[in-house]
Amino acid sequence: MRLNLYHLLVLSFLSLITLFSCKGPSNSGELVGARLNKLKANKTPYGMVLIPGGTFIMGQSDEDITFSQTAQNRQVTIASFYMDDTEISNSEYRQFVNWVRDSILITNFLGDDSYFIESSSGERFIDWNKVGKNSPWRSNDENARERLSSMYYQGEDRIFGKNELDVRLLKYHYEWFDLRAATSARGDRTKSRSDFIIRDTMLIYPDTTVWLNDFSYAQNEPMVEGYFSHPSFDEYPVVGVTWRQAQAFNTWRTRLFNNAASSNKTMERLPYQLPSEAEWEYAARGGKVGMQFPWGGPTARNARGCLMANFKPGRGNYIDDGNAYTAPVYSYFPNDFGLYNMAGNVAEWTQSSYNESANSFVHDMNPTYTYNAKATDNEALKRKVIRGGSWKDIGFFLQNGARQYEYQDTAKSYIGFRSVTRYVGVSN
């Protein structure tokens, strides 16, 4: 018995040697490949759902009642991607605002080196673990409280001496590499990499005055004062955010995850960004063919007569769906992909620039049309596609194929956004 066990161990050892020798050592002179870190499986990002790739007919699914012909039908193919299951909420966007607020306080005002860590190259970075455990905003130290008071409104800007954050200080600097511009100039040897790095600095606090700007002679002051700052609205969609602010948010969100991945020695994620309008429409349809709405159709009510989304069902009637303004982001039933409020609640920014005939000339594989408009460009070049309709829109704009636009520097009380990120590999 002991001899048989010995023979078994010897055979097992020889089998392992044979197995590993078949793979070919790196110094064998054979082409064996240089593999990157092993990735067991794509993990769905928190708060997102996988949108499996497929093909669909993009454009109007019903009569073009305005006869605008801006959403011509076209069969296209979309690769797999991840998408937020809801619109970005006030609480999620506030995490971004608080990060910028704390960064500015620690870097420019606090003067406390204990909130920094130093890398091996000598660079200093904020220690976010310490910020989370010992936030300077909760400090009882008299010197620290005096320094952080610099971030409040000062002098005549104060009301009854109340400490209120001066949101004009909340600016976020971000950078990104313009791949399309670099590709177009790939044969130009006079260009360097820095020529294609776009740098921008944005005020990132939402414009709360949109509730008054968008509606004349309407008593919306309570929404100005509480919509973004009151905890009752935490799970409502953020509004008053421009297209450029949404871009800044996605850059920050990408860095937030990738910095954590670097610390944990795990795989980084491809950038978060706004969906193209083709991706948005494909996701909104939820795999249904030729349907008007994310839930199917042909009406905006279910068999019991209940409205399926938050919109304006009749003249002067905003509240038949149960909400006078926006609704919480998990309201109503999701579509077949698990996405909430792809019709109504708030219209959503997309990555795509608006062109009336875009459906006619974009590619039939992952179609998109983008243009990085500068401040000096013509206003028509600053138009960005918005999709889905909103709480103040009539039912026509809730259709999957309905297209609208808004200018990239414009904030509205009825426009929000959600993010996507790429699925790496093949999903089926």
Language-model segments: residues:
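Bacterial N-terminal signal peptides that target proteins for export
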Residues: 2-9
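Short, P/G- and charge-enriched loop/turn segments at secondary-structure junctions
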Residues: 36-38, 70-71, 371-374, 403-408
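A short glycine-rich, aromatic-capped structural motif
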Residues: 41-230, 234-246, 344
